[in-house]
């Protein structure tokens, strides 16, 4: 079964009140919230779908980078991507700190877990950060937006 995600993650208090055209704040578990970056958002800002994992880019599009940097003025945020199908796939993450890029893009099967660790997520024994915040609840970005009423 396929899984795709393109989103901005952050502590709930950091992302609280964030408003981006075409998306809606989705509370997750462990004090984390998410701004899913679906089709409407990508079209509105002219950004590509999964630029790091699908398009093979080595840096974020400027529109997404600027939005993340602005959000990170209030605390750390992470831009994340995931693309899996049939047990094969990759994740990407970019951590933003104090209004700028903290780490270069990371492509790895656990890139989202590493970003969530940096955001302060401590999973219980036998779990990982991805599961601890509930990112497995939906299989793609548009489902997250539908569940949030966007």
Regions found by a protein language model. Give the residues of each.
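Charged interaction segments
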Residues: 32-150
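Short, extreme N-terminal segment that most often corresponds to the first beta-strand
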Residues: 1-29, 149
């Amino acid at each position: 079964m396929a899984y795709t995600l393109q989103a901005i993650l952050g502590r709930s208090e950091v992302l609280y009140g964030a408003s981006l055209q075409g998306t809606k704040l989705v509370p997750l578990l462990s004090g984390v919230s998410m701004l899913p970056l679906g089709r409407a958002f990508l079209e509105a800002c002219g950004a590509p779908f999964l630029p790091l994992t699908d398009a093979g880019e080595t840096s974020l599009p400027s529109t997404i980078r600027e939005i993340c940097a602005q959000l990170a003025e209030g605390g750390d945020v992470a831009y994340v991507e995931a693309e899996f199908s049939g047990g094969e796939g990759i994740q990407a993450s970019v951590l933003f700190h104090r209004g700028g890029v903290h780490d270069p893009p990371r492509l790895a099967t656990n890139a989202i877990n590493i970003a969530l660790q940096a955001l302060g997520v401590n999973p219980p024994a036998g779990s990982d950060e991805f599961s601890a915040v509930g990112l497995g609840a939906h299989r793609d970005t548009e489902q997250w937006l539908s569940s949030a009423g966007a």
